[in-house]
Every structure is written in structure tokens, then in C-alpha cells.
Amino acid sequence: MDSAARNRLDRAAPRAAGHQQDRAAPHALRDYALLADGERGAVVGPRGEIVWMCAPSWDSDAVFASLIGGEGAYTVTPEFRSVWGGYYEEGSLIWRGRWVTDEGVIECREALAFPGDAHRLVLLRSVTADGGPARLSVSLDPRAEFGRKALRALGRDDTGSWAGRLGDLYLRWSGDVGDARVLRAGRGSRLALHLVVPPGARHDLVLELSDQPFDEAQVDAAAAWRATETAWAQAVPPLGGVTAGRDARHAYAVLRGLTSSSGGMVAAATTSLPERAEAGRNYDYRYAWIRDSATPGRRWRPSARTR
């Protein structure tokens, strides 16, 4: 981690006494999923916890930093015991988290609206239930500047959507979240929601973060999902003439998700995760390194004939 980021993390405001934020234990990296739209990325754990995301850009300060021991997470998780799983929709970075519970099967489809806007991120989460009602706990606890600043100036409008400030960012949370409770979180606030989704129904959650005030209406979840599906279908070629085409398309989707509108491709979405334990090689990967960008280009050059 660079010194500036480390200092901000070390100066993070202490949590108020009595505030119990469920901090999930870390998992092996292979158990996490990546959501990315070209301008930023989010890392999702098997419990439905978003444990890493920088906003509004790859190299901005993290608003969810629990992956590296900081504060901030956005969790949509079953209330009762479950067995987790999940998969990417082919040729995209649309993730379907899946939990088998005693009552049925819960799915949470999630993505960053694609392609991304450099100033404004839209994080889509859609919960469905099969075989029985989905009972979930939802917690939105973003923390600006690697955990230093909690959500403030929080209010609810006539549509039931929430809006507030997060450091220098503007936040809006919509999708039938009017019943969410405001809880104290240090010197700011967090939102908690008990969610019950009947079998066959769907519940959308839409989180927006921007470095500019919201001048437009809140996001229509159904329209945003359609646009994201279409954009991924157009962005990832069939690659029918290569070996292991499905894997190749997924790799292509990952590289596209890491590539911004400027043409630069970040090495990875995260920072400071060691390559090996106590090896002293903890790099900030959220930048376009020439070596890391050149290697995929060399590997993908033969596939250009299949497009």
C-alpha cells in the first residue's frame, strides 16, 4: 500500500461503542467475484459482502475496504444457514451469487452498470427466491477515504430512496428501500434492511455514487440491467475459433472490465494484497502498468482474426 493510503487507513475514525458491524472473516481469493465496468471494480465475497470498491475511479480512495482490514462494506446475505455458490453469466462480469437454504434457493444477481461512467458508478443487485421466501439482511455501510469518513447528511425522499454524502461523494440508494433503518456508525450513519422476497418475486437494489450532484432521475433498474446485458454482448466477441472458447470469453470479459474509456488497463482492482506471505511485495495494482498491459496484448493478438 502506498504511504498516503496507509496513513488514511491508520487515521480511520474509531467505531462508536456499541456499534457492531458484522465483519466477515476473509476467504481465499478464489472465493471472491469481481464486478467491473471499465472505470472501477468491486470485489464480492461468498456471503454477499462487497469488501472492496474505490469510487469514482480505480485509483480513488476506497469506500469499501474491509478486504484489507479497513472499514466499509455492503452486504446482502441470507439470515439463516446456507451453502453458497455462484457463477458469471457467460461473456460478462454479471455475477449470480447463489445460496441454498433450508427454505429454498436465493440468488443475488449483481453487476456494475456497463459501460461505466467516469464520474458516476451504478451498482445493481437483484434478489430472487425459488422454492421458499428469501430472508436476507442488508447492510449499507460505505466509508470514504479508506474508512475515515462515514455516511452523513442522510435523508429519504418521497419515493423511498435514500440520499446522502460520503466524503466528497454523493450517494443515492433506491429500489424499495424505504423501510431501511438508520443506525449510528462512528460519527456518521449506516443503513440496515430486513428483506423478505417471496418465491418468484424480484427485489432490486441500486446504489449510485458520484463526484457530481445527481441532476438526473434515479436509475430504472430494469432498464439498467437490459443496457448492461446488451453492452456486454456487444463488447465480448464469440471467439469461436479458439481453444476453450468459454474460458477465453470470460478472460476477455475480465480484461474489458479492467480497461477504462481512456484505453488504459489496470493490473487489478485491489491494492496491497501480497503475492506471497511476508515477501514484502505488496503493490498497488490499481494503475496501468506497461508490463501488465503488454502481456495480455501479446496473448490476445492471435484472436483478432476470430472477431
Predicted feature residues:
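Acidic, mature catalytic/reactive cores of soluble proteins
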Residues: M1-R307
